[in-house]
Amino acid sequence: MSYLDHCGVYVKDLENSLAFYKEIFGWKEKTRWTSGEAKIAVLDMGKGLMELVQRPGSPGAPPGGNWTHLAIHVNDFTDKVRKLEEKGLELRKVTMGEGAHIAFFKDPDGHTVEIMEKGLSL
């Protein structure tokens, strides 16, 4: 069976992005390395990995990028919303059919992130 192993995103400031995702989601840093001028760190999300890549001139979320958003299933939706609001982030909250709650926000690099109580795979 095939599955998604990790997603990789460009970031402007590796340390800032690591701190953001660790604080909001409690993810742990799995490893980090350099490749040429690139600094790379991998976060363990529990059921998959997120690779953060900082290169000289990394744009963060490129205008008109090739992906729309990163969707993250959380067990503590209300707590995550509270943490994000405390950080001053603007949230777009939506209630889907059957009472599933989701919220969209921008991470420090402008990537659209979705948090959800019930994932598509559940």
Regions found by a protein language model. Name each.
Residues L14, F77-T78:
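Residues at or immediately preceding the N-termini of alpha-helices
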